[in-house]
Amino acid sequence: MFFSPRRRHLFVVLTVMLGGALAFGTVGTAVAAPPPVPVLPALPGVTTPPLPTNIGPSVSDPGSLYRHPADLASMAPGDVIRAVKRPNPFRTIPSEAWQIAFRTNNSHGKPMVGVTMVLVPFNHRADIPVLSYQMIINAMGMRCQPSQSVYTTTDWIASPVDPWGFNFALARGWGIAIPDHLGEKTAYAAVRMSGQVVLDGIRATTRFSPLRLRKSKFALSGYSGGGMATGAASTLQATYAPEVNIVGSVWGGVPTNLTQMAEVIGTDNSHPAFGLAMAASLGLEREYPKELPISSHLNWLGLQTRAQMANACTNEILAVGFGKSAQMVAKNFDMLNAPETRKVLALNSIASMPEIAKAPVFEFHSPTDPLISVKSLDATMKRYCRAGTKVYQLSTPAPEHLSAAAVGFFPAYEWMADRFAGKPVPSNCRG
């Protein structure tokens, strides 16, 4: 078996030591796909140069995957724009790797380009199970998104950990789709947009004929920031992409209520994870510049912090924001209770989304997690249960957000394997 008891132990130790799961091959030759999908030459090299941190917008992908085609608006969500064959990501089982650009929508229903990476075992049979794995991207920079980060060590909190999830899937003969779920603006916390990117990435995976995955079953998985994208995708699936065959989703450590997340991290008191709350605010500003002009309410320290975070990954965001508070970086709090602010937060909080996840859900968290509202998470799961969704919740014995990822990993993946196998779905819905 791929994960021996010793390897499981090493994984848990490594994950906790590295901040616990906030959750080399040569360059391949491009393979032509049937028209009308253009296949680009393989991108030279697998590293990304350092990017400046003193500018506002996210730095774009240095390749051409995110380039908008002239006919983007006429394409359907999930239609493939272009694809490129890529080398195997670091520390993963050798596999066939593709990056696929596709049409998707932003939060306002406008067309944009999404990107997903798909790994499949060599010489795989058609229509194998596929896991859509939403990486732990609590970030502001395009270099932190999977299309780049799987080839670098830019985000040392997530990058050593995520390959374990990739390898678990590949070792079982599954494919794995890894979307850039923060979109082309790297709009962290724009959860509704992220869910749409995930679903359209699955559509693109089934429509790209060289992969032979047209009739595949899909499961979703993600922790922390990746869990928000996973939760949004599973919640929106029935209305946004009802034809997508999702057999289940795994949510880990998911902040389901952005307002409560901000309150937990605090406005008056300094907090070691304040950087995540500020990054979420700035990410929402990128997606909703008119409704949330956050930058105009920042003082000099806030603007300096914003510049330092502009293209930062998780570890950098945590370092820049360590010990700060909203009181320290804001000129005023006029926006906090503004109707526009509350509306945007509600639109991007899974707890207040009117849609209901229909596919089974496995949800796990630490009962004493200081970064999420467990009360909101439990209420969301109860609402799904009342609507008939089969939910299994696991309250791990982990004391906080980081170590809970390691503790919940294996039971979550075994649950997922059972969904692909068509076994009866357990549920511990209550109340």
Regions found by a protein language model. Name each.
Residues 203-274:
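Primarily recognizes the serine-hydrolase "nucleophile elbow" in alpha/beta-hydrolase
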Residues 117-118, 127-139, 143-151, 249:
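Short beta-strand element of the alpha/beta-hydrolase
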Residues 333, 337-344, 348-351, 368-371, ...:
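C-terminal catalytic histidine-bearing segment of alpha/beta-hydrolase fold enzymes
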Residues 161-165, 188-210:
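Alpha/beta-hydrolase active-site loop
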Residues 32-125:
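Catalytic-loop region of hydrolases
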Residues 1-33:
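Secretory targeting and sorting signals
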Residues 44-64, 68-71, 255-354:
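Accessory cap/linker subdomain of secreted extracellular hydrolases
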Residues 357, 362-369:
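Short beta-strand/loop motif that positions the catalytic acidic residue
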